[in-house]
Amino acid sequence: MRFVTCRLPDGVEDPAILSQDGTQVWPLSWLGLSYETLSDAIPFLTPQVRFGLQLAISGIPALPVEAVTLQSPIPSPAQDVVCLGINYMAHSDEAEKYSADAFATKHQDAIYFSKRVSRAVPDGGFIEAHTDLVQKLDYECELAVVLGKDAKDVPAGQTKDYVFGYTILNDVSARDVQTAHKQWYFGKSLDGFTPMGPCIVTADEFDTYPPALPIRSRVNGELRQDSNTKLQIFDIDHVIHELSQGMTLKAGTIIATGTPAGVGMGMDPPQFLHPGC
């Protein structure tokens, strides 16, 4: 099942179900579920509830997707996005070549940081350039995991049931800000730096866990990143297990699992994003 947040014709934002082919939506309010945000709804959208919703929408007219404006599935996350740094070996190599000081890659443990998101950018939306602060604007295509229930002290190998679903996230990064401050929070948290979506696909739509998925990004049609999530150094099971030790991960938590090689700073010479491109 696919979940979105959409702006209805009357201007109200409502979490909704997106059809498999992406052409229709059913606002949850039409189905008797009055949740202000998808984050609020997620803890209650259990497999049993979703099964009932699937039966219900088969007999209810939908809105054509053209009649609504899709937002990011979780426009304003309740907490910062949890991110993994340097989680693909090829990206580790390119990052260290760009700046060994800022991206030292000799580590045996996962690198975690957080990303402030005041308002996530919808699919096809605009990234703010912040030209007064940023001259080296970069992109990072990532698989993001959305938790469906609170996770605390979850054993390794038992994290699957905590995953609500997956979405796509662009961890936009100001490389000059990032390297100047010797840490990543500020350079990744500027307004408009988190395109995400268009939808969350529930975990039960994938045959394997963790899923092995192609992950690609393009800039103006040019393929830049082309990898597979099976190449992650620390997989989703490891990450949820480790982060939940002594720390409660709330339902609705978003975990961005790292980007593969092919980012702008890794090219020779580096090729960063510019306003209008």
Which residues make up each language-model segment?
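Catalytic-pocket segment enriched in acidic/His residues
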Residues: 13, 49-54, 61-63, 68-69, ...
